[in-house]
Amino acid sequence: MKALLVLGFLLLSASVQAKVFKHCELARILRSSALAGYRGVSLENWMCMAQHESNFDTEAINYNSTDQSTDYGIFQINSRYWCNDGKTPRAVNACGIPCSALLQDDITQAIQCAKRVVRDPQGIRAWVAWQRHCQNRDLSGYIRNCGV
């Protein structure tokens, strides 16, 4: 019985480990997911935004006390508008997903939700980190030597 508890704990802890992508690994995934060039947003811009939002960490979570919302995952997608965390007042959930889906090692749902975000009029400007760190900058270094 004790061995089963230990095994269960080990399996549970393994399933909640954060994935921190290496930059070329993430660049290849974003390219193969048709995010590169989506709505005119280059792969370099996506990479810059993801680095400055989460440092490529799938389990990044940041609480915003001003509006009681939380940003989730590699793209730091906000619970006020895009996902449901069950605690953000007046949440819209425009992506139609639980915020926990944005914390998965498999970032397929995060990519789909990011595509939904950029379809709005703000586009990539919805991400403050992109505005502060990426907009109107030379971003070529984000994919240099990645073969993408």
Curated annotation (Swiss-Prot):
Signal sequence interval, chain numbering: 1-18
InterPro entries listed in its UniProt record: Glyco_hydro_22, Glyco_hydro_22_CS, Glyco_hydro_22_lys, Lysozyme-like_dom_sf
UniProt keywords, alphabetically: Antimicrobial, Bacteriolytic enzyme, Disulfide bond, Glycosidase, Hydrolase, Secreted, Signal
Residues covered by the C-type lysozyme domain: 19-148
Gene Ontology CC entries for this record: extracellular region
Subcellular location: Secreted
One term of GO molecular function: lysozyme activity
Catalytic activity of the protein: Hydrolysis of (1->4)-beta-linkages between N-acetylmuramic acid and N-acetyl-D-glucosamine residues in a peptidoglycan and between N-acetyl-D-glucosamine residues in chitodextrins
Annotated S-S bridges: 24-146, 48-134, 83-99, 95-113
Active-site residues per Swiss-Prot or TrEMBL entry: 53, 71
Extra facts: Lysozyme C is capable of both hydrolysis and transglycosylation; it also shows a slight esterase activity. It acts rapidly on both peptide-substituted and unsubstituted peptidoglycan, and slowly on chitin oligosaccharides.
Subunit organization: Monomer.
Summary of the function given for this chain in its UniProt record: Lysozymes have primarily a bacteriolytic function; those in tissues and body fluids are associated with the monocyte-macrophage system and enhance the activity of immunoagents. In the intestine they may also have a digestive function.
Similarity-based family: Belongs to the glycosyl hydrolase 22 family.
Protein name: Putative lysozyme C-2
Organism classification: Eukaryota, Metazoa, Chordata, Craniata, Vertebrata
